[in-house]
Amino acid sequence: MRTYFGAASVAAAMLIGAIGAGAQTAPQPAVVYDAGGKFDKSFNEAAYNGIERFRKETGGTYLEFEVNNDAQREQAFRRMAQRGASPIIGIGFAQAPAIRKVAAEFPKVNFTIIDSVIDLPNVQSVVFKEHEGSFLVGALAVMSSKTGKVGFVGGMDVPLIRRFQCGYEQGAKHVDAKAEVIANMTGTTPAAWNDPTRGAELAKGQFARGVDVVFAAAGGTGLGVYQAAKDGKRLAIGVDSNQNHLHPGTMLTSMLKRVDTAVYAAARTAREGKWVPGTTSLGLAEGGIDWALDEHNARIISAQMKERLETIKADIIAGRIKVHDYMSNSACRS
């Protein structure tokens, strides 16, 4: 059994339609990963899976670079542009300053950035409505909690991660107004994305306060959270990629952020001469955000929980449930 609500094929069709329409030639694409490496089992790895899907389906090739520090970002994009790559796909909001500068220097090269918006004629921006998916998993967390206390571990303390936290809190309160959400951020530097030891420490601290379900939006740091949940016989929620398989039976679900499909769509539409600049925002309705149900968590998701969560999802898509976006006013209304 392997079921993803918002199946990959459907999401791909919707995202390709949203991201590409127009006509132009397309040289070899390139991907510049964010800190944490392409095999972080989360955000970067989703991007890697997307470009690998492009390679396998089209027979095309691509260039790639893994950023280890901020000083490498601008150099990486400039090098890719000099090599004639296009589109050059930057993974993560931290790539924005480098792309903004290099894209201005190479106006005939196309760039795609994931998780940020750059207003330049040769840049395509793809952002996600993370608050919608976080609302869903927050609701599921409280449905599954026996204590009424659920946790959140964020990576780097930035507005994007506050958006995750805020959506999660709203979903939890939607199910139970008395639910308590205990939240921690890992740090204030990019190192916060790749510190599983600290992630485990934060999770254990929350468990000691009564938390029995924890959601990590923290890149590689989340791996420590998930291990701590397994060791402590609690439940954890993955992020970005489907991480249910990491610890079957204690991974309640994963909030899917279809970075893989966005990267695939950018490369594929460029190859087909349909890449266009501009901003695309992807949420539940567009198939860019969802939750994961598969053979690894099916036993801990009851039919009633699934039905209720799908109803909440439909209500968000229809506008019957309004999910406040932290980034609209830098505040959370849960």
Language model features by range: what are they?
Residues 7-18:
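Bacterial N-terminal signal peptides
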